[in-house]
UniProtKB/Swiss-Prot annotation:
Superkingdom in the source lineage: Bacteria
Family: Belongs to the class I-like SAM-binding methyltransferase superfamily. rRNA adenine N(6)-methyltransferase family. RsmA subfamily.
Record EC number: 2.1.1.182
Function according to Swiss-Prot or TrEMBL: Specifically dimethylates two adjacent adenosines (A1518 and A1519) in the loop of a conserved hairpin near the 3'-end of 16S rRNA in the 30S particle. May play a critical role in biogenesis of 30S subunits.
GO CC terms, sorted: cytosol
Protein name per the record: Ribosomal RNA small subunit methyltransferase A
Keywords: Cytoplasm, Methyltransferase, RNA-binding, rRNA processing, S-adenosyl-L-methionine, Transferase
Protein's gene: rsmA
Catalytic activity annotation: adenosine(1518)/adenosine(1519) in 16S rRNA + 4 S-adenosyl-L-methionine = N(6)-dimethyladenosine(1518)/N(6)-dimethyladenosine(1519) in 16S rRNA + 4 S-adenosyl-L-homocysteine + 4 H(+)
EC primary class: transferase
Coiled-coil zones: none
Molecular function, one GO term: 16S rRNA (adenine(1518)-N(6)/adenine(1519)-N(6))-dimethyltransferase activity
InterPro entries: KsgA/Erm, rRNA_Ade_diMease-like_C, rRNA_Ade_Mease_Trfase_CS, rRNA_Ade_methylase_Trfase_N, rRNA_adenine_dimethylase, SAM-dependent_MTases_sf
Predominant localisation class: cytoplasm
């Protein structure tokens, strides 16, 4: 079933406070949809559908998809385009506060898609990771710099807290770049598409994931300082000198496996 409305968004201006940059390049839209490979049986949710450019392609394969949109002015416009699909649902709310768990079950995990507002992308990814057991995969358009951070390994200048904590939960794939001219208005930065696939069986398991998160956050708090200096700020009675690790190393030199082992040594 084809979407007949050619330009339902005429007159709607992108809002800076919502971080809106509308994707308009059909070639890129097609490439994103091919990467996702939507199916009718998918439990698909799109965050920030904007003009509905990607939605229009996805919904033809998955008519029961849902979207989460904060901008209330976009709701009637999206309904005008997609109300012909009886199972299409819109949640007019802030994705940062939304309980994505209510949309999924272990038998029907979510597939999450989104052109995420760059000003909230990192906290939103951390929010979504908390629902990792209920998510099959995630495909996001993000600032290229954020994608590089997500995919970075030890020793890379982009490697940090976001890298470690995302890779603890997910396999990360940097798929392809998207130049500014593909958007209206044009962002001042390059963008990229990333695929995050939560592990069904994690390669490294922390006994206390909350402690691992605290450890990683503390270790990267001041990147130029050594582990010895940063880990003093854990505010717990810990014998750091007894650890089987060189405390003169910096946070960006430790692998995910080393962080998990360190966490399990400190908090068995």
């Amino acid at each position: 079933m084809k979407n007949k409305n050619t330009d339902p968004m005429q007159g709607h201006r992108a809002r800076k406070r919502f971080g809106q940059n509308f994707l308009e390049d059909q070639g890129i839209i097609n490439a994103i949809v091919r990467s996702i490979g939507p199916k009718a049986s998918d439990n698909l949710v799109e965050i920030g559908p904007g003009k509905g450019a990607i939605t229009a392609q996805l919904i033809e394969s998955c008519p029961s998809m849902q979207v989460v949109e904060l901008d209330r002015d976009l709701i009637p416009i999206l309904l005008a385009q997609f109300a012909i699909y009886n199972d299409f649902r819109i949640h007019q709310t802030d994705a940062l506060k939304f309980d994505f768990g209510q949309l999924a079950t272990p038998e029907r995990p979510l597939r999450v898609v989104g052109n995420l507002p760059y000003n909230i992308s990192t906290p939103l990814i951390f929010h979504l990771l908390s629902f990792g057991e209920l998510i099959a995969d995630m495909h996001f358009m993000l600032q290229k710099e954020v994608v590089l951070r997500l995919a970075a390994g030890p020793g890379d200048k982009n490697y940090g807290r976001l890298s470690v904590m995302t890779q603890y939960v997910c396999q990360v794939e940097n798929l392809f770049e998207v130049p500014p001219e593909c958007f209206n208005p044009r962002p001042k930065v390059d963008s990229a598409i990333v695929r995050l696939t939560p592990y069904r069986t994690q390669p490294f398991v922390a006994a206390h994931p909350d402690k691992l998160a605290k450890l990683v956050k503390t270790a990267f708090a001041q990147r130029r300082k050594t582990l010895r200096n940063n880990l003093k700020n854990l505010d717990e009675e810990l014998d750091l000198e007894a650890l089987d690790i060189d405390l003169t190393r910096r946070a960006e030199s430790l692998s995910l496996e080393e962080y998990v082992n360190l966490s399990n040594t400190l908090w068995p």
